[in-house]
A protein has these predicted regions:
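Conserved active-site alpha-helix within GNAT-family acetyltransferase domains
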Residues: 606-634
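Radical SAM enzyme [4Fe-4S]-AdoMet core and its adjacent flexible, acidic
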Residues: 371-416, 422-467, 569, 573-577
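Short, electropositive alpha-helical surface patch
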Residues: 224-232, 345-364, 424-443, 614-625
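Conserved GNAT acetyl-CoA-binding A-motif
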Residues: 593-606
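Flexible, acidic/Gly-rich N-terminal and inter-domain linker regions that tether
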Residues: 2-178, 182-191, 195-245, 413
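Conserved non-cysteine loop/helix-boundary elements of the Radical SAM core domain that shape
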Residues: 173-191, 211-235, 240-402, 577-580
Length: 636
């Protein structure tokens, strides 16, 4: 690689002979190397240097070569602390020099120098330069990839589900993940790499990644296809910071998994899509051997007649059994719900949502609400065209909206609503609800009514961590699938002075001092922000165990999550909520509760990249008969 200055780039992503003026172009390039020439074109180099020199005025460390880019990065601190001042200075210089360097370009260079320890970390500057904060404000970076189109992407024919032969079942070209998949020939390595590098360039840490695998029904793909696909995801994660000039060969899936435990870019969770009736002992064992931690499954509806109408071929009994088996064996559960299906009405769907909210057998961790859309390549489009199916979202839109508002107000605090409305472009929707930003519309209407929703997503701390010091552990118990779920979370309330918590502290101190009894706080009712949470399951005695017998009498920690600005695992004292002991305290509390419920230990469905975290607290990896790691276990 030719060098034009003393700055040597470690990460290689575009052709060294090509000048790229827009970093988005880098991602679609099929070449591998990047040089300073490709990041900053020759004809703009002097302009950019003059731009940066004038914007900054700072004496650098004399041991570091004076560099106009570094001068720009460490300019006046007042500029960094004020978004308005930063933008004003930026715009003035853009006008003067008739050029506009992207923030992502500047931030990319900043991170290069930071990784080489040439410059100190500047958190305020990062806040000004990072784009799309929302991508990592939930504590992890989510990368969605899609399986290749295949004759067996789904062997079922649900009448609402599009079957475009060019793509995996239920997906269309216009969806963002599908577009990225097609650009990368549905290759797992390329999809992961291009998405991760895009995030990295835009300023997000990429050392904690959660993978969502989309595309039909995962269980319908042949094991060889699915295993190789996941192997390539781990390979991409393990080698993302390697020199592409000397790339190593792919190893087996299980070798790549072991490498990922100690990689810079760790996969901390994998989500797959399947059907409730596909949840079996064999399938759950296979999922764990792949590193899968979360299962998305389509419930769609609770009325068997409606499910039969749309040829779902899956009954309520099968749905409940699948949910129970997965939860009893430690998995996180996301469910998909479809109001406005053929033969449904607002009254029927209201009853459906009531059932899913209140019935212990339907309790899930996350929801995706997908109002039925009439699309090409579906059977229901024929019914729609002939007039035998008329979605009530068209005939009674206000009732449709009011139903969803009621749902959002009624969601229990242990559930997260991930999405409302599929990501279909508006021009693909031929009938039913055509509002593509439906969640935003609902959020606005709820805000107008001054209502605070209690679901997890509505209460996430995001980047506003100013009340983190007020967070306390709140416990919620609820029945679920013939077992008990304990939802522990760090929350803060909007009370001026929380009398309930004050009284709890006094009672807790006295009971512990005189009787050795632990008292738990169940909330004051005014909690408005969540910082972290943990899901602990205590299964019934005779539940169906899919794994080793040592797994049976354990409290299952199905999820541990800390929200807020995502900090790198290499930051020992990052800003925001992460790395401040929230996870440790929840883990300790869960172990105490499991002990009180006569468990002989706890086990965690730990993502591959989180195993070392749990080892710090006495957890050890449990191996199956094929010597594949499954759960992290701690015996009391």
């Amino acid at each position: 690689m030719s060098q034009t200055s003393s700055t040597n780039f470690k990460y290689v992503i575009v052709n060294k002979d090509t000048n790229i003026t827009d970093l988005e172009d880098i991602i679609s390039s099929n070449s591998l190397e990047i040089t300073k020439n490709s990041l900053i074109p020759d004809d703009k180099r002097e302009l950019y240097y003059s731009f940066m020199n004038e914007l900054t005025n700072i004496d650098l460390n004399p041991d570091i070569e004076p560099n106009p880019i570094l001068r720009f990065l460490f300019s006046n601190s007042k500029l960094h602390n004020s978004y308005q001042k930063f933008e004003e200075a930026y715009k003035k210089l853009c006008k003067k020099y008739k050029t506009f360097p992207k923030k992502s370009q500047i931030y990319y260079l900043y991170r290069q120098e930071l990784y080489k320890n040439n410059i100190p970390k500047n958190i305020q500057l990062e806040k000004q330069l990072i784009t799309k904060h929302i991508r990592s404000q939930s504590g992890v970076l989510v990368i969605s990839v899609i399986m290749p189109p295949d004759n067996f992407s789904c062997s079922y024919n649900c009448y609402y589900c599009p079957n475009d032969p060019k793509y995996s079942r239920s997906y269309f070209k216009g969806e963002p993940t599908v577009q990225r998949g097609e650009q990368n020939n549905f290759d797992a390595y390329k999809q992961f790499y291009s998405r991760a590098i895009t995030y990295f360039i835009n300023g997000h840490p990429i050392d904690k990644v959660e993978i969502i695998i989309l595309g039909g029904t995962f269980s319908c793909y042949s094991p060889s296809i699915s295993e190789n696909f996941i192997r390539d995801l781990f390979y991409a994660s393990n080698t993302i910071f390697d020199s592409h000039i000397t790339m190593r060969e792919r190893k087996s899936l299980f070798e790549e998994i072991e490498i990922n435990e100690h990689a810079i870019c760790k996969i901390i969770g994998i989500t797959v899509e399947t059907r409730p009736d596909k949840i079996t002992k064999y399938e759950l064992r296979r999922f764990r051997s792949y590193g899968v931690t979360r299962i998305q499954m389509g419930v769609q509806h609770t009325d068997d007649l409606i499910l039969e109408k749309v040829n779902r071929q899956c009954t309520q009994v099968q749905i409940k059994k699948g949910i129970k088996l997965a939860k009893d064996n430690g998995f996180k559960i996301d469910i998909h719900i479809m109001p406005d299906l053929p033969d449904a009405s607002p009254e029927i769907d209201h009853k459906m949502f009531q059932t899913i909210i209140n019935d212990p057998d339907y309790q899930a961790d996350q929801w995706k609400i997908y109002p039925t859309n009439v699309l090409e390549f579906t059977e229901i489009k024929k019914w729609y065209d002939e007039g035998s199916y008329v979605p009530y979202a068209e005939t009674n839109f206000n009732e449709f909206i009011n139903l969803l508002i009621w749902v959002m107000k009624s969601i229990p605090p242990w559930i997260r609503i991930n999405r409302i409305q599929r990501d279909f472009p508006g021009n693909y929707i031929e009938g039913g609800n055509k509002i593509t930003n439906l969640r935003q519309v609902l959020d606005n209407k709820i805000a107008e009514q001054c209502i605070q929703c209690k679901d997890i997503r509505s209460m996430e701390v995001k980047l506003n961590d100013e009340n983190g010091h007020k967070a306390r552990i709140v416990r919620i118990d609820y029945d679920a699938s013939d077992g008990k779920e304990i939802f522990l979370s760090h929350k803060s309330c909007n009370c001026f002075f929380c009398w309930k918590y004050f009284i709890y502290q006094i009672m807790s101190f006295l009971l512990d001092l005189f009787f050795g009894i632990t008292l738990y706080f169940y909330g004051c009712g005014n909690e408005d922000t969540i910082y972290s949470f943990l899901r602990l399951r205590i299964s019934s005695e005779n539940y169906e165990n899919c794994f080793a017998e040592s797994f049976r009498n354990k409290g299952k920690i199905r999820e541990l999550h800390v929200y807020g600005k995502m900090n790198s695992t290499y930051e020992s004292n990052g800003s925001g909520v992460q790395h401040h002991g929230f996870g440790r305290s929840l883990l300790s509390c869960a172990e105490k509760i499991a002990f009180e419920n006569n468990c002989d230990g706890t086990c965690v469905i730990a993502g591959v990249g989180t195993r070392n975290y749990y080892r710090k607290f006495g957890y050890e990896i449990n191996y199956d008969e094929k010597n594949h790691g499954t759960f992290m276990i701690k015996n009391f």
